Swiss-Prot record:
Organism listed in the record: Xylella fastidiosa (strain M12)
InterPro entries: NADH_UbQ_OxRdtase-like_20kDa (IPR006137), NADH_UQ_OxRdtase_20Kd_su (IPR006138)
Family from the record: Belongs to the complex I 20 kDa subunit family.
E.C. number: 7.1.1.-
Subcellular localization(s) per the UniProt record: Cell inner membrane
Cited function: NDH-1 shuttles electrons from NADH, via FMN and iron-sulfur (Fe-S) centers, to quinones in the respiratory chain. The immediate electron acceptor for the enzyme in this species is believed to be ubiquinone. Couples the redox reaction to proton translocation (for every two electrons transferred, four hydrogen ions are translocated across the cytoplasmic membrane), and thus conserves the redox energy in a proton gradient.
One GO location term (cellular component): respiratory chain complex I
Alphabetized UniProt keyword annotations: 4Fe-4S, Cell inner membrane, Cell membrane, Iron, Iron-sulfur, Membrane, Metal-binding, NAD, Quinone, Translocase, Transport, Ubiquinone
GO molecular function: 4 iron, 4 sulfur cluster binding; iron ion binding; NADH dehydrogenase (ubiquinone) activity; NADH:ubiquinone reductase (non-electrogenic) activity; quinone binding
Name listed for the protein in its UniProt record: NADH-quinone oxidoreductase subunit B
Top-level EC class: translocase
Predominant location category: membrane
Classification via SUPFAM superfamilies: HydA/Nqo6-like
Assembly notes: NDH-1 is composed of 14 different subunits. Subunits NuoB, C, D, E, F, and G constitute the peripheral sector of the complex.
Amino acid sequence: MGVIQAIDRLMTNPIPDGQVDDILRPQGESPLLQKGYVTTSVDALLNWARTGSMWPMTFGLACCAVEMMHAGAARLDLDRYGIVFRPSPRQSDVMIVAGTLVNKMAPALRKVYDQMPDPKWVISMGSCANGGGYYHYSYSVVRGCDRIVPVDVYVPGCPPTAEALVYGILQLQKKIWRTQTIAG
């Protein structure tokens, strides 16, 4: 039996007496059998690929970085979500800013962000990265990394748990699913 015949057998209607289930298998031939390929919107395909292979770059500045390392350890296993930490901004599409951002580090954060290829996303992890946190009134602290780079997801906590970071990453995946990449 050839490949097309096997696919045809799988694509035929499983409901008896010739009834057609319009939701699962619409009436008529499938595009795969007619033309040999399946069509989908390019946005859906790109977003599926992007959510399945997010490569974050760690920008650990303080104690939140320890929880970020904990999220990448064996207990939570970010690899099952297709998330692999990358050492270089040119290889990553997500930046996780974890910890207190001081004024001297702000230009370096922006420089690293600018080196990332498009499309790029930022997760702000912890109270200090979100809004200055405990050091909010210090003269040397940036009151939120969103003043330097655009932030897509905020993960609250001091420090946030590794589970909270995983939840934030899953929220970013949902946000990526909803984006429209190609102007239409």
